[in-house]
């Protein structure tokens, strides 16, 4: 094994400390939970839930924000094509976000991701939020950079949401959703000002509300 491969393996193993603690408490199916898309002005919020097999190394798994699109896509493909990896996704619409607020919508997306897992976890590691759930759970601040299963969930959610935003770009090409994925960049704000909001904008978010 070369030095780079060893470093990648060690980095991954350093992110399994929380999982190992929970394994030693007697749990066996530990799901990492993360969301993508709380901050954007447009598009849904998406959550991922991922159960990684104990003892198997997935080199390169890291906080999705620290990976290039190419790296994320490669790791996503590895995860979804591994029969020992179990994952679920939850999507909450713009309409629902505007109805109940982004925090509650995020919790709904996380609950949906857990429900969509093909097997039932017995413990949850959740990035940054206390998630009311019948399954025991632990909140980990900045969990996507500390927990392998949360990082894997963040990658799966990010890739799925980015694909959705590219689809929305085909329907609403004036806004550049394929580039900024709905976040409030200068180009996005300029397009909002020029064209007004479309159906996939979050009307409850101040920068969108201000252009009505």
Curated annotation (Swiss-Prot):
Q: Identify the domain of life.
A: Bacteria
Q: Which HAMAP family match?
A: RNase_HII_B (MF_00052_B)
Q: What is this protein called?
A: Ribonuclease HII
Q: What does this protein do?
A: Endonuclease that specifically degrades the RNA of RNA-DNA hybrids.
Q: What is its main location?
A: cytoplasm
What would be an example GO MF term here? RNA-DNA hybrid ribonuclease activity
Provide the E.C. number(s) assigned to this enzyme.
3.1.26.4
Keyword Metal-binding carried by entry: yes
Which Pfam families does this one have?
RNase_HII (PF01351)
Subcellular location(s) of the protein:
Cytoplasm
Kind of enzyme, top EC level? hydrolase
Q: Which residues form the RNase H type-2 domain?
A: 28-212
The cofactors it requires, by name, are: Mn(2+); Mg(2+)
Q: Which residues bind a divalent metal cation?
A: 34-35, 127
Q: Which CDD domains does the record cross-reference, listed alphabetically?
A: RNase_HII_bacteria_HII_like
Q: Which family does it belong to?
A: Belongs to the RNase HII family.
GO CC terms on record? Answer: cytoplasm; ribonuclease H2 complex
InterPro entries xrefs? RNase_HII, RNase_HII/HIII, RNase_HII/HIII_dom, RNaseH-like_sf, RNaseH_sf
Q: What is the lineage of its organism?
A: Bacteria, Pseudomonadati, Chlamydiota, Chlamydiia, Chlamydiales
Q: Which reaction does it catalyse?
A: Endonucleolytic cleavage to 5'-phosphomonoester
Q: Which GO terms describe its biological process?
A: DNA replication, removal of RNA primer; mismatch repair
| Protein encoded by which gene | rnhB
């Amino acid at each position: 094994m070369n030095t780079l491969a060893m470093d990648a393996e060690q980095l991954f193993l350093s992110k399994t400390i929380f999982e190992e603690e929970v394994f030693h408490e007697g749990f066996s199916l530990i799901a990492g939970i993360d969301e993508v898309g709380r901050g954007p002005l447009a598009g849904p919020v998406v959550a991922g839930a991922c159960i990684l097999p104990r003892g198997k190394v997935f080199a390169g798994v890291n906080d999705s924000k620290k990976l290039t699109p190419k790296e994320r896509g490669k790791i996503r493909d590895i995860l979804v094509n591994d029969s020992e990896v179990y994952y679920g996704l939850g999507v909450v619409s713009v309409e629902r976000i505007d109805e109940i607020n982004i925090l509650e919508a995020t919790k709904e997306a996380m609950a949906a991701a857990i429900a969509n897992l093909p097997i039932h976890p017995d413990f949850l590691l959740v990035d940054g939020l206390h998630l009311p759930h019948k399954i025991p759970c632990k909140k980990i601040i900045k969990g996507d950079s500390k927990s392998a299963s949360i990082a894997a969930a963040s990658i799966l959610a990010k890739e799925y949401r980015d694909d959705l935003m590219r689809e929305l770009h085909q329907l609403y090409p004036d806004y550049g959703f394929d580039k900024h994925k709905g976040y409030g960049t200068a180009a996005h704000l300029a397009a909002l000002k020029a064209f007004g909001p479309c159906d996939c904008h979050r009307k409850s978010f101040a920068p969108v509300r201000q252009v009505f």
